[in-house]
Design a protein with these regions (language model features):
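A feature for loop-to-transmembrane-helix boundaries and adjacent hydrophobic helices
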Residues: 1-291
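Arg/Gly-rich low-complexity intrinsically disordered repeat tracts
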Residues: 293-304
Length: 304
């Protein structure tokens, strides 16, 4: 565990901040590459990224403050303190803020929401995988005690002071679990992108995969300051993950119903058109036979 990547005198380069910067750059690069394949302009991606990063950081902080409201209500001066700034934030807070911003952005720029989000979510998955490595180095988002041989023991006093991670105790490396999970999701999304049937499939797939993975991983988390609901039955992120899964189910049901109605309408329209064409052809054949009989009758008649 190395909270600081570089320390020279009084200068300290935080490992978490460094990994976050790498995640942002890697995410922008990936989004630009994917956007080119489907006709999304690179300049648009860069403009969007310059705004959404700030929005996501603010959203992550806001949800962090909400989940720890009992503390911040008693210490309101800490809301804008340097200590709060160093805490990072809650992923879903940043994601939801970015999502609402994206809805506004695509309306203003008059582009498809589904196409845009299909381009963006692989970058989100990759960025999360990289950022969680920074979490591991800083000691935040640590796991519960375990006897598993792959458990990790943290020993850095600075990390303990900053994040509260227990020292000298074997813990689940939940940061690495989530990093591996989101890296796998990233690979699935890259494979899926050129094979999708509809715009929005990749976006919805990401939401479902991450929500399911995050819901399960939360059971292994040991940090108690991430917020809970329903008398500690679910963490804040688990509750949001369930809402996301419910929302995705609703979208798929809506798509299935409306897709079936559209297919039925097309089928009925095709049947009607076929009947009209068939009737017209039958009429033409009948007229043709009538004309042929009349012609033969005229040929067989004798002049008086």
């Amino acid at each position: 565990m190395h909270p600081y990547l570089i320390s020279i005198g009084s200068f300290h380069l935080p490992t978490y901040g460094t990994m976050l910067a790498i995640a942002v750059l890697a995410g922008i690069y990936t989004a630009i590459r994917l956007g080119r394949r489907v006709g999304v302009d690179s300049a648009l991606i860069l403009d969007y990224s310059s705004w959404v990063i700030l929005v996501a950081l603010i959203g992550a902080k806001v949800l962090l403050i909400i989940t720890l409201w009992s503390y911040y209500r008693a210490h309101p001066e800490e809301i804008f303190s340097y200590a709060t700034l160093k805490l990072g934030g809650v992923f879903y807070g940043g994601f939801l803020a970015a999502l609402f911003f994206t809805i506004w952005y695509v309306r203003v720029r008059k582009i498809s929401f589904w196409k845009m989000t299909d381009v963006l979510v692989p970058s989100v998955a990759l960025g999360t995988a990289i950022t969680r490595l920074g979490c591991f180095s800083a000691g935040c988002d640590y796991g519960k005690p375990t006897t598993a041989p792959w458990g990790v023991i943290f020993s850095n006093a600075l990390a303990h002071e900053a994040t509260g991670v227990p020292l000298g105790v074997r813990l689940h490396p939940t940061q690495l679990y989530e990093s591996a999970t989101t890296l796998a999701i990233f690979a699935v999304l890259l494979w899926w992108s050129p094979r999708k049937k509809h715009d929005g499939d990749v976006f919805l797939g990401y939401l479902g995969l991450y929500a399911a993975g995050r819901f399960l991983l939360e059971y292994l988390r040991g940090d108690e300051n991430r917020g809970f609901v329903f008398h500690h039955l679910l963490s804040t992120s688990q509750f949001i993950a369930l809402l996301v899964l419910a929302g995705i189910s609703g979208v798929f049901i809506w798509r299935r119903v409306h897709g079936s109605e559209k297919a039925s309408a097309l089928s009925e329209g095709s049947s009607t058109e076929f009947s009209q064409v068939a009737g017209a052809n039958a009429g033409q054949r009948k007229n043709s036979r009538g004309n042929h009989k009349a012609k033969r009758k005229m040929q067989n008649s004798k002049p008086v």
